[in-house]
Amino acid sequence: MGIQHEFDIIINGDIALRNLQLHKGDNYGCKLKIISNDYKKLKFRFIIRPDWSEIDEVKGLTVFANNYAVKVNKVDDTFYYVIYEAVIHLYNKKTEILIYSDDENELFKHYYPYISLNMISKKYKVKEENYSSPYIEHPLIPYRDYESMD
């Protein structure tokens, strides 16, 4: 049947990007475009719920914002989930963010989802699903303890 992890992103405890994982496979990631009109500091929480059926360890995450590497910290690691956090500073009107476990160009073109977040108008949209079934939850109502960002 193949591996299927679950991958979600929580932004500032207010927006959840759900089901960002691929339908099958050991990779997870997405491309984000964030529009804002002034400086913003956003706290990201990356939640991976691994499928241990065919793997021994979970791949790490790499994050780039406008081609600059973002420091990602692993904050929790249990059998049921692995949580990473990062702070991303938005200086430009448009910020492109790449989040991935594997940066193969083909994955961004045809597999990882592409999501647009307009922080000015509060319009959030899945632009391309590709090989995933993502959806956006706003406002976020955390239903797991590790989803709240205190």
From Swiss-Prot:
Expression triggers: Expressed in the early phase of the viral replicative cycle.
Superkingdom of origin organism: Viruses
Biological process, per Gene Ontology: symbiont-mediated suppression of host innate immune response; viral process
Keywords, alphabetical: Early protein, Host-virus interaction, Inhibition of host innate immune response by virus, Viral immunoevasion
InterPro entries cross-referenced by the UniProt entry: Poxvirus_C7/F8A
Family membership: Belongs to the orthopoxvirus OPG027 family.
Record's function text: Inhibits antiviral activity induced by type I interferons. Does not block signal transduction of IFN, but is important to counteract the host antiviral state induced by a pre-treatment with IFN.
Protein name as annotated: Interferon antagonist OPG027
Source organism of the structure: Vaccinia virus (strain Ankara) (VACV)
